[in-house]
C-alpha cells in the first residue's frame, strides 16, 4: 500500500520531527597523509589574531614569542586575542561575589586530590607525545619511558608513586644542564636469504644513549605534538589537534581538576556533566529566564558560535585567573597550579611528519621532514604551501614552531568554561544597572545567551554589551554564525530546545549496528544501545522492536551465523547445521552458534548467555564457558566492559555493557609485522608493563582496592597482600598447611632477591 508521508506527522508535534532531517548517513571523512599543513595553518592563524601584540624572545630556548595581552583594545567584528587582564580579574571577582566561597571550596577539594593522586593517573589517555623518542606513543609507554629516563638522571622523587612527586622531578629536570636519554634506532642491511638465495633487507633494533643539553630538553618538554582530527562531519577542511607530553600532562590535570570543581557549582556550565543531567541543569536556567519575562519583558535567545575559541584564548589569561582563584591558598598549591599556564605560554608546536614528494617520471618518493622546512628551497612547493612556510619560518626551532598565544584544541575545556560563565554571570540586573539583563549556558566554546528586556531596543543593547564584554577577555562571538530567536527555541551542544529539550534520536543512528569487536561483545553492545535509546532518546517500543530485529539480522550476516534450520548457505553453515542437529535444546544455542533470538524489548538488560543458560545442553554449557579451551585467546573480562560508540555528532561516547566471558569473547591477534620494525623494543616494554599491571590487579581486585597510602613499591604491596590473604585462607581452612608454607617461602625468596638487586 502507498503511504502518504505527511500522514506520519499528523499526531507528531513539529519539534519531534527533527530526527527526519538527519544528514549524516555513511562514513565520516578521515584524514590521510601528513598534518603538517593544518598545523602550520593553526600556528599562522593564531599569530594573525594577536599580531598587534609585543614580540619577545624566550631567554632559555631562544624562541620568538608574541604577547597580545593588555596590548591594543580589540576591534569590533574582527576576531582577536587582545584580552585585558583587569577585565578578566574583575569578571572573576563578580563570579565569586555571586557565588560566595566557590573558589575557596574548590581549592580545598583540589588540594585533597593533589595530595592523593597517583602517578598512574597519567596512563589514562591514548596517544601521547613521547619526548624521549620524539613521537607519539600510548600514554602508559610514554610515562614509563619518562620515568625511566628521570631515574637514570638521578631524579627519584617519583618513586613514591604520587603524581605531585613526579611533578617535582619534572620541575627539577628543567634546571638540569643536560639530560641523558635512550633512543631506539634501526639499522638496515642487505643480506642473502639462505633458502631463496634472494637479497633481503634485514632490520636490527639498537638502543643508543644520547645527551640533550638544557635548551634541547626544554624544547622537547614544552612540545605539543600535532595530528589531524579525524571523522569530523560537516567540514570541508581538516584541522589539527595537539597531544602534550608527559611533562605538561600532570600540571594540566590539576588545573582541570580545580576548574571542574568550579564548573560543578555553576548552574550555567554545561560541563562536566552530560546526558540527561546536563539537560536538566540547562532547562533550569531557561525556565528561570522565561518565568521572569512572562508579563512585561521580551525574552530572546542566541544560539551562539564563537570564532576560533582556542586560538584567541591566551594562557597568560588563565594564569591570571588561577592567581586570583587561589589567592588565599598555600604557596606550594599556587605554584603547582600556575605551572601549566606558564608552560603553555612557552609552548612549541611540533609540525608533524613533514611533506611527501613524488616524482612521476622517476618513480621516486621522498619525505621532507618538518625539521628541513626552515632552510629548504621553496621552489618545490605550490603557492599556498610556500606562503605558509614563509610565514612560519621566523618561528621555527628544530622542526617545532614557537606558539605562545592560543591554547590548542581540547586542553583547558573546564577552565575556559569558567571564563565564559563569568561573562554570563555579569548579565544580572545588579551588574548591568539598566533595563536589560542576560543569562545563558556555556560548555567549552559553545554557548547560548538568553537576553531579557522591556523592548527590542533593550534586547539589541543587551546583546551588544555582551558581545563587547566578551571581546575584552578574548572571546569572539561570531555575528555571522550566531542567530537569535524568541526564547523557547535554540540549540546548545547539539541539544535542541523547544519548550524542553527534544530527543534527537537520529543523532544516535550511527551507533546502531554491529561493532565488530567479537561475537560476544557485539551482541551485548547491540542490545545495550537499543536499551539506552529507549531510556534516553524517546525510542518507542514498536521502533525498538524493529531495531532489534534489524540488529539480529545484521549480526547474523556479519558473523555468518544464520539459524541452524535456515536455507542460507555460508562458509559456516555446514558446521552450524551439524551443531543444530546434535543439540537437544535448540533454544539454548547462542545466536552466534546458529540459535534462535530470544531477545525482546523486555529483556534487553540480560546478557545472552544468562538469558539462555537454563535452556542449554550440559555439554554445550561446558564447551561455551570453558576457560581452558585452547582455541581461545582469553580476555579476562570484568562484569562490565566499556565500548566506544560513535554518535553522528560530537565526541565518541563511552558506553558500559555487560560482558560475560565465553569462548566467543576472542581477541584478534596483534599483527606480526610489527615485530620486525623499530617498534619492537617498545612493544616488548609495553607488554611487560601490561603484565605487571595485570599481576597487580590480581592481588588487588578493584572491589577491595584502596589506593595504597604511604610509600611502598608494587612488589612490596603484592608480597604483603599475599601474606595476609594466605593467612586468612589458612586459618579458615581454605588451603592446607603445606600450601601456606610454600606461599610464605616464595614471599621470602622474592624479598631476598629484591635486597640483592
From Swiss-Prot:
Nuclear localization signal (motif): residue ranges: 187-195, 203-216
GO terms (BP aspect): DNA-templated transcription; symbiont-mediated suppression of host gene expression; symbiont-mediated suppression of host mRNA transcription via inhibition of RNA polymerase II activity; viral RNA genome replication; viral transcription
InterPro entries: RNA-dir_pol_NSvirus, RNA_pol_PB1_influenza
Main location: host cell
Region named Promoter-binding site: 249-256
Stretch list, region Disordered: 50-82
Catalytic activity: RNA(n) + a ribonucleoside 5'-triphosphate = RNA(n+1) + diphosphate
Description of how the protein assembles with itself and partners: Influenza RNA polymerase is composed of three subunits: PB1, PB2 and PA. Interacts (via N-terminus) with PA (via C-terminus). Interacts (via C-terminus) with PB2 (via N-terminus); this interaction is essential for transcription initiation.
Places the protein is found: Host nucleus; Host cytoplasm
GO molecular function annotation: nucleotide binding; RNA binding; RNA-directed RNA polymerase activity
Post-translational modification: Phosphorylated by host PRKCA.
Species annotation: Influenza A virus (strain A/Mallard/New York/6750/1978 H2N2)
Keywords of this entry: Eukaryotic host gene expression shutoff by virus, Eukaryotic host transcription shutoff by virus, Host cytoplasm, Host gene expression shutoff by virus, Host nucleus, Host-virus interaction, Inhibition of host RNA polymerase II by virus, Nucleotide-binding, Nucleotidyltransferase, Phosphoprotein, RNA-directed RNA polymerase, Transferase, Viral RNA replication, Viral transcription
Translocase as UniProt keyword: no
UniProt record similarity statement: Belongs to the influenza viruses polymerase PB1 family.
Gene3D superfamilies: 6.10.140.720
Record's compositionally biased regions (Polar residues): 55-64
Name of the top EC class for this enzyme: transferase
Assigned EC number: 2.7.7.48
PROSITE patterns: RDRP_SSRNA_NEG_SEG (PS50525)
Protein's job: RNA-dependent RNA polymerase which is responsible for replication and transcription of virus RNA segments. The transcription of viral mRNAs occurs by a unique mechanism called cap-snatching. 5' methylated caps of cellular mRNAs are cleaved after 10-13 nucleotides by PA. In turn, these short capped RNAs are used as primers by PB1 for transcription of viral mRNAs. During virus replication, PB1 initiates RNA synthesis and copy vRNA into complementary RNA (cRNA) which in turn serves as a template for the production of more vRNAs.
Family matches, as HAMAP family: INFV_RDRP
Any one GO cellular component localisation term in the record: host cell nucleus
Signal peptide: none
One Pfam assignment: Flu_PB1
Segments forming domain RdRp catalytic: 286-483
Protein name (database record): RNA-directed RNA polymerase catalytic subunit
